[in-house]
Swiss-Prot record:
Name used for this protein in its record: SPI-1 type 3 secretion system translocon protein SctB
Record keyword Zinc-finger present: no
A Pfam match: IpaC_SipC
UniProt organism field: Salmonella typhimurium (strain SL1344)
Reported function: Component of the type III secretion system 1 (SPI-1 T3SS), also called injectisome, which is used to inject bacterial effector proteins into eukaryotic host cells. SipB/SctE1 and SipC/SctB1 are inserted into the host membrane where they form a pore and allow the translocation of effector proteins into the cytosol of target cells. Plays a role in promoting human PERP translocation to the host apical epithelial cell surface via promotion of exocytic translocation.
Domain of life, per lineage: Bacteria
InterPro entries associated with the record: BipC/SctB
UniProt subcellular location: Secreted; Host membrane
Family listed: Belongs to the SctB/SipC family.
């Protein structure tokens, strides 16, 4: 900052001092002419005021007369209030303008602080073009590298999907085979059981009902022979067939009469009977005996028909069960095939997904390889461009060295 002192000649002060900035190590000085011009005082006005810094040779006698005159003038000026006010106003104005100029210079210097020396203009335009191309290729190289990495991840995911699909395919095929075998075995077992039961029923009918029918049929034939023998005529032959006895017995809860011991014996022999004495066959049977035999014959024939119907119905039911069991066993293969086909269908779907995943894997792998190849080509091109830039810089440096040598020469 500038300090104004009253009683000091402004012209002498401005001519003998310069405005400096004490805070800067290498400050820029401001001349008095610049300060006076900034406040509107030109050189001509300074000359008119008698404040010009230009010195001239003093007139003779000045060295002895002037000091007293100047001293008197200064003493009078100090006492003059108007003069002091004018000088103070002039000093304040000069100080303000000087501070403004100094601050402007300081701001300009501070704005230039931190700037580096720009050598961009010294390089060749071809180098700048190659540098831009190098930056572009580097960007492309990075993009290719990222794309290759992502495609590798896609390929890996597709491989994992394929592996999972293969596992699911195997599980579906296995479950289908197990379901088919289990269902077929179960249905075959049911059919075999029904067929076996039908065979057992038919066997039981033949064992029980057929035996009863045979026994009743034999009894019926015996009774018919006795009844039919009443109309026969004896021709005098010896040892004529005869029915010696007729036994009566109970069967079950119903009281029935049974004809036993119908034998062919000679006339000389006799037999003992339990209930009725029967004469020789060549003799007539009493009507009472004929009625009993006829009634028994009807009962036996009724039992034969009943047993025959029972056996036929049992055999029909048994055959029906056998046919049902055989049909179930034959259809077990078809039903089991349907169950197995469902598993094969699921396995086929998984196989189609495997094919899609494999295609995705191949496409991603191929694209990843192409991206890596493009990245390698970009790297090679960048290296070639760097070599070209180095060659250009070396040529430029050689040319500048030659020019500098010529200038020194």
């Amino acid at each position: 900052m500038l300090i104004s002192n009253v009683g000091i000649n402004p012209a002498a002060y401005l001519n003998n001092h310069s405005v400096e900035n004490s805070s800067q190590t290498a400050s820029q000085s401001v001349s008095a002419k610049d300060i006076l011009n900034s406040i509107g005082i030109s050189s001509s006005k300074v000359s008119d005021l008698g404040l010009s810094p230009t010195l001239s040779a003093p007139a003779p006698g000045v060295l002895t007369q002037t000091p007293g005159t100047i001293t008197s003038f200064l003493k009078a000026s100090i006492q003059n209030t108007d003069m002091n006010q004018d000088l103070n106003a002039l000093a304040n104005n000069v100080t303000t303008k000087a501070n403004e100029v100094v601050q402007t210079q300081l701001r300009e210097q501070q704005a230039e602080v931190g700037k580096f020396f720009d050598i961009s203009g010294m390089s060749s335009s071809a180098v700048a073009l190659l540098a831009a191309a190098n930056t572009l290729m580097l960007t492309l190289n990075q993009a290719d590298s990222k794309l290759s990495g992502k495609l590798s991840l896609v390929s890996f995911d597709a491989a994992k999907t394929t592996a999972s699909s293969m596992m699911r395919e195997g599980m579906n095929a296995l479950s289908g085979s197990i379901s088919q075998s289990a269902l077929q075995l179960g249905i075959t077992g049911v059919g075999a059981k029904l067929e076996y039961k039908g065979l057992q029923n038919e066997r039981g009918a033949l064992k029980h009902n057929a035996a009863k029918i045979d026994k009743l049929t034999t009894e019926s034939h015996s009774i018919k022979n006795v009844l039919n023998g009443q109309n026969s005529v004896k021709l005098g032959a010896e040892g004529v067939d005869s029915l010696k006895s007729l036994n009566m017995k109970k069967t079950g809860t119903d009281a029935t009469k049974n004809l036993n011991d119908a034998t062919l014996k000679s006339n000389a022999g006799t037999s003992a009977t339990e209930s009725l004495g029967i004469k020789d066959s060549n003799k007539q049977i009493s009507p009472e005996h004929q009625a009993i035999l006829s009634k028994r014959l009807e009962s036996v024939e009724s039992d034969i028909r009943l047993e025959q119907n029972t056996m036929d119905m049992t055999r029909i039911d048994a055959r029906k069960m056998q046919m049902t069991g055989d049909l179930i066993m034959k259809n077990s293969v078809t039903v089991g095939g349907i169950a197995g086909a469902s598993g094969q269908y699921a396995a086929t779907q998984e196989r189609s997904e495997q094919q899609i995943s494999q295609v995705n894997n191949r496409v991603a792998s191929t694209a990843s390889d192409e991206a890596r190849e493009s990245s390698r080509k970009s790297t090679s091109l960048i290296q070639e461009m760097l070599k070209t830039m180095e060659s250009i810089n070396q040529s430029k440096a050689s040319a500048l060295a030659a020019i500098a040598g010529n200038i020194r020469a």
